[in-house]
């Protein structure tokens, strides 16, 4: 996924509603633990732990999360142990990204972490697999403190199965020494510039469905119906979807466009000065800001003009990071308490300050001045009202591969305006195919 991988979750998206971790050491001192969480694919297994010496009942918890959050989560786990001295907590951690959580947990639920982070498009899949423990501790408080859309993304059939803590979508970074605020209002404005030293005016990961869907959403197309829950509906092949296809074919053919820019190319392009603007998210904010310095800027995605002359605002696919509790944990009350701690207001604020993560906590997200003080989070907030929350229905599993294939065919030139309708029909047919 990112990934196939928000004005009041970040303020208006979260109220309007528009798809990682571990710890070691202890709060004081302790002994090492050798248990480890498993990981595979793009995840890297690691282990480590520590035992609090505060006393009382001994409780061992395993926590999974992405590599980039490990140190932060260790700190939060240690603070949890210190805040609960009536028990002795030991923690083991494994490196498993949010994107890989469902795959790794479902390999063997009984052997998976007690607490793990996952992306919101996996909620229904994990629930249907019997992998998530229903939230029964402080549920009303969690619902009240977080945005409506994030709670919806963590729920199935009205029951809460996770603890949301990050709102996520993509937006546009740009080098303000190369482009003005007026230039970046539209793709046409960006692409019209001739900029010394720049080989790519605008970069986008065309064959990544998470990003690609933004063009279709901008034109008014729907993935799985109006609310994203109808597995029989996808209209990317209608008249407006066809105009999106036309636009992408022309855009990819422009030598000033970077058609297949993943995170590494975006970061290196800004670092060496050959890139003027690119679509990405908060996870790259630190490195891009370091590269651009005083010329660092970010804003909502640009508008683009369809072949009928209509100008539309590019949309985006939004999701949430959620902390879940294993349905087979031996310590459900402690695991729920830890998951709630890792996602509480204070720790969401810490993630905002240290990782540029946009909070789902309503009070934090409503602090417009603070949110806008972070350029990347401010841009995410601007884009939020144009975002569509990523669905978690099982049918979504069928979306990523056809989206990738469609993008690759445009890049390769095998999808042309002559056969575009056939390609779009095949795209939609594959998305709506019966799940195996």
Tell where the protein language model's regions lie, with residue ranges.
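A structural signal for short loop-to-beta-strand junctions that line the ligand-binding cleft
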Residues: 106-107, 111-114, 142-176, 200-205, ...
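Extracytoplasmic/periplasmic solute-binding protein
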Residues: 161-165, 170, 188-234, 275
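Glycine-centered hinge/linker elements that transmit conformational signals in sensory
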Residues: 230-260
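Conserved C-terminal helix/tail region of periplasmic/extracytoplasmic solute-binding proteins
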Residues: 368, 381-436
């Amino acid at each position: 996924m990112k990934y196939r991988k928000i004005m009041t979750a970040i303020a208006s998206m979260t109220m309007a509603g528009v798809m990682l971790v571990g710890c070691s050491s202890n709060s004081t001192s302790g002994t090492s633990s050798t248990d480890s969480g498993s990981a595979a694919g793009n995840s890297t297994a690691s282990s480590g732990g520590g035992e609090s010496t505060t006393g009382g009942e001994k409780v061992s918890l395993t926590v999974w999360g992405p590599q980039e959050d490990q140190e932060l989560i260790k700190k939060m786990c240690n603070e949890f142990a210190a805040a609960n001295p009536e028990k002795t907590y030991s923690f083991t951690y494994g490196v498993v990204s949010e994107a890989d959580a469902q795959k790794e947990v479902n390999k063997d639920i009984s052997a998976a972490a007690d607490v793990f982070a996952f992306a919101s498009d996996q909620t229904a899949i994990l629930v249907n697999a019997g992998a998530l423990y229903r939230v029964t501790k402080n549920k009303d408080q969690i619902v009240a403190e977080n945005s409506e859309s994030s709670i919806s993304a963590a729920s199935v059939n009205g029951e809460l199965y996770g603890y949301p803590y990050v709102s996520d979508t993509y937006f546009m970074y740009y080098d303000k020494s190369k482009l003005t605020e007026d230039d970046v209002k539209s793709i046409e404005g960006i692409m019209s510039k001739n900029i010394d030293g720049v080989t790519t005016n605008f970069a986008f990961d065309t064959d990544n469905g998470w990003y690609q869907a933004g063009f279709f959403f901008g034109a008014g197309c729907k993935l799985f119906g109006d609310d994203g829950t109808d597995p029989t509906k996808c209209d990317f092949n209608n008249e407006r979807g066809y105009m999106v296809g036309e636009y992408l074919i022309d855009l990819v053919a422009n030598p000033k466009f970077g058609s297949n820019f993943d995170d590494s190319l975006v970061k290196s392009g800004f670092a060496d000065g050959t890139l003027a603007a690119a679509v990405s998210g908060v996870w790259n904010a630190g490195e891009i800001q370091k590269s651009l310095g005083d010329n660092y800027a970010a804003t909502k995605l640009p508008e683009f003009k369809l072949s009928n002359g209509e100008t539309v605002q590019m949309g985006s696919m939004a999701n949430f990071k959620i902390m879940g509790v294993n349905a087979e944990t031996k310590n459900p009350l402690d695991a729920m308490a830890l998951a709630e701690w890792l996602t509480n207001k204070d720790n969401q604020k810490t993630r905002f300050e240290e990782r540029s993560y946009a909070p789902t906590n309503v009070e934090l997200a409503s602090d417009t001045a603070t949110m806008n003080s972070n350029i990347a989070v401010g841009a995410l907030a601007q884009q939020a009202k144009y975002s569509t929350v990523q669905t978690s229905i099982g049918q979504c599993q069928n979306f990523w591969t056809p989206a990738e294939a469609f993008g690759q065919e445009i890049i390769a030139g095998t999808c042309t305006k002559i056969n575009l309708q056939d390609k779009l029909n095949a795209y939609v047919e594959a998305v709506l195919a019966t799940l195996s």
